[in-house]
Swiss-Prot record:
It catalyses: S-adenosyl-L-methionine + a thiopurine = S-adenosyl-L-homocysteine + a thiopurine S-methylether. It comes from the Bacteria. This is Thiopurine S-methyltransferase. Keywords: Cytoplasm, Methyltransferase, S-adenosyl-L-methionine, Transferase. GO terms for cellular component: cytoplasm. CDD domains: AdoMet_MTases. PANTHER family: THIOPURINE S-METHYLTRANSFERASE (PTHR10259:SF11). It comes from Shewanella sp. (strain ANA-3). It is an enzyme of class 2 (transferase). Gene3D superfamilies: Vaccinia Virus protein VP39.
Length: 218
């Protein structure tokens, strides 16, 4: 998935992947991570997700990484948050009291930025990558996370041949095969969400499962 693809999507506001509401699995299961208020939480490929507002409301310090500048700017504008901007190497750093977003390539994000995080949340990152690039992202995520950090992973799974991603289908088998070397994995929930996703219904995708996993960095 080339950077130009995502920049074009944001420029044209073709952002069907952006959810207008907080993810239900986040609301339902975040407490199972048992993170204290004040804990740093990393959100990879964060876009302008409202989920970051939920995490901040839990008292966390949110650290996000997003490739597209417009997405980062819209997060602060849409939520009427004052922010400051500064350069950090090849990344731009946008921050307010509880949210720090780093605009740039996650593969070149300095590990020092996430060195003190104790939690992480991935709803739209893993499923954004085609299978040919997904394992590389998963390894980069693991390298950015300290040992013992805990996170909530949300995936979508469906017959990939029925629809071209993103979001791409990520099966439970893929999660176990590619993440188990770096994470302890616990499946928390899996639900059929086809009726809630008109794009998939329109394309006659036969089923669509959303799953939530608790991950712990080994």
């Amino acid at each position: 998935m080339e950077p130009g693809f995502w920049h074009e999507k944001w420029q044209q506001q073709l952002i069907g992947f952006h959810q207008q509401d907080i993810n239900p699995f986040l609301v339902k299961y975040w407490h199972t991570l048992a993170l204290p208020a004040g804990a740093q939480v990393f959100v990879p490929l964060c876009g302008k997700s409202l989920d970051m507002c939920f995490l901040a409301e839990q008292g966390h310090q949110v650290i996000g990484c997003e490739l597209n500048e417009l997405a980062v700017q819209q997060f602060f504008e849409d939520n009427q948050l004052p922010m400051q901007q500064s350069a950090l190497g090849e990344h731009q750093h946008y921050h307010t009291e509880q949210v720090s977003l780093y605009q740039g390539d996650i593969f070149t994000l300095p590990a020092s930025i996430t060195g003190k995080v104790s939690g992480f949340y991935d709803r739209a990152a893993l499923i954004a990558w085609p299978e040919s690039m997904r394992a590389q992202y998963a390894k980069q995520l693991a390298q950015l996370l300290p040992q013992g950090s805990v996170g909530l992973l949300v995936t979508l799974d469906y017959p990939q041949e029925a629809l071209s991603g993103p979001p791409f289908a990520v099966s439970p088998t893929w999660v176990e095969t590619h993440l188990s070397d770096d994470f302890d994995i616990q499946l928390l929930d899996c639900q059929d969400v086809l009726a809630d996703n008109p794009r998939f219904v329109k394309k006659e995708v036969p089923w669509l499962n959303e799953a939530a996993y608790l991950l712990r960095r080994r």
